[in-house]
Amino acid sequence: MHWITRFSAFFSAALAMILLSPSLQSFSPAAAIRSSHPYADEFKPQQNSDYSSFRESPMFRNAEQCRSSGEDSGVCNPNLVHVAITLDIDYLRGSIAAVNSILQHSMCPQSVFFHFLVSSESQNLESLIRSTFPKLTNLKIYYFAPETVQSLISSSVRQALEQPLNYARNYLADLLEPCVKRVIYLDSDLVVVDDIVKLWKTGLGQRTIGAPEYCHANFTKYFTGGFWSDKRFNGTFKGRNPCYFNTGVMVIDLKKWRQFRFTKRIEKWMEIQKIERIYELGSLPPFLLVFAGHVAPISHRWNQHGLGGDNVRGSCRDLHSGPVSLLHWSGSGKPWLRLDSKLPCPLDTLWAPYDLYKHSH
């Protein structure tokens, strides 16, 4: 359990920095998505960065008490924990750090199967992943064709929210093998600081997805005035208790998803959006329209979200109260960009130990 001591040290250091900084402030979930800043160019991803320069990850082995995979070491092995993450050249450093964090904190790392979603076949990301994690055998690359969803995407408040790969999670039930009945979907801008199997074992009851919910958020802000004033739409949530949830951390029952054809339901709302303009925030609102009020609640410890803040100089996010199992830099600010720019937020120091980029910090 050496990682507990290591994490505690980083955690304590970050908290001390938070207490000493008068400029830290909190943002609502909506603000974390919408925020922008006058220094944006300083934090833009560098398209020509040498993303092949990653250190090789050490080998992570299962503890003795882990269930044996037996002869079946393929994706259909019932003892596997399935995790889906996108691979994009601009966020690749974040994705690799996320994988590294999961392996470091898992008691049974060899029982975790990673499903990587890519939207380009020309960047050879599979070779990069395999060279960075040479001992990781439980992985597969899935090509998500941008044209699958391109015609359904509407303009958003941030161009980054319009990228087709943001919508790949809508198609996990189609992309992954039919034998995969459940999957954890994770964004690329987070690290896991607890055993992922605890999240995997979350009970969903009769629900199709599970996620931490935030019922204090002003739910009406996620849709336009036209949506709420139109009789065709304003009854959508009737009989439901809709709450905001962040789609960057979800446990998904793929069997139910396939059974009830939720991909088609999401696509229907995206088609309406193209004509009616009922929301502004990219891939999140269609999920809210379909699932809000029908989500199995998961402990907030599994999504300490909004840590990206808005990159305004001297303005950073604090942690929510309570225990922490997952740190999520949602919002426009990413820890690797701030660290490289020598303008980090205190909590970015908790991301840095999982960074495998050779020439960082």
Swiss-Prot record:
Pathway: Glycan metabolism; pectin biosynthesis. Keywords: Cell wall biogenesis/degradation, Glycoprotein, Glycosyltransferase, Golgi apparatus, Membrane, Signal-anchor, Transferase, Transmembrane, Transmembrane helix. Its EC number is 2.4.1.-. It is a single-pass type II membrane protein. Its main location: Golgi. One of its GO terms (biological process) is plant-type cell wall assembly. GO terms for molecular function: polygalacturonate 4-alpha-galacturonosyltransferase activity. Residues 28-361 are lumenal. The keyword Cell wall biogenesis/degradation applies. May be involved in pectin and/or xylans biosynthesis in cell walls. Belongs to the glycosyltransferase 8 family. This is Probable galacturonosyltransferase-like 5. It comes from Arabidopsis thaliana (Mouse-ear cress). The lineage of its organism: Eukaryota, Viridiplantae, Streptophyta, Embryophyta, Tracheophyta. The gene is GATL5.
